[in-house]
């Protein structure tokens, strides 16, 4: 169990813009945000408002145009590419709308694969994968090929892969977007269970109001500004 209520992320005057064909496209200009260890945060807003961009900044998949992003007090915008990769491997789990599981491998092998590629002995990675699958209620499907799994089971397997190394934060981009309502509700509840049981910080980009309502914080990105709807 991770210690809660310590600051995990602090964004200070963060701006992000891209150069368009004729002019700069401003995604957001000055975001300030604190996320504590153990928080569960929904990020909502219209398409194109910058929700996924914010998630990418937290996960070191992109850099801000200005400002600082602190992780446990350390400025991750100043990290080298190697340091960012190490942070992602150790501290960050990602879940996306599409699971990107490989059909030629079974469920447990898919969950273990990233750790094996990173250098973990296969036996150790498979043991960790078995435990992760147990946490998401998928022990009985460990030896099954991915093609035999339902949509909800595949997303659960993707979540198991994301939590394999017990990261400090799970970043999920539309994790229920490709699922029917009932299955999406089940996956949403699983994410909240992991947040509570493991103390894992959860940041979810979603258009699903049912999923957003489960979180203890709801942030809206609108016209380049961030609004905390719990304030």
UniProtKB/Swiss-Prot annotation:
Residues 9-230 form the ABC transporter domain. GO terms for molecular function: ATP binding; ATP hydrolysis activity; transmembrane transporter activity. Pfam families: ABC_tran. It comes from the Bacteria. One of its GO terms (cellular component) is plasma membrane. The complex is composed of two ATP-binding proteins (LolD) and two transmembrane proteins (LolC and LolE). Belongs to the ABC transporter superfamily. Lipoprotein translocase (TC 3.A.1.125) family. This is Lipoprotein-releasing system ATP-binding protein LolD. It comes from Oleidesulfovibrio alaskensis (strain ATCC BAA-1058 / DSM 17464 / G20).
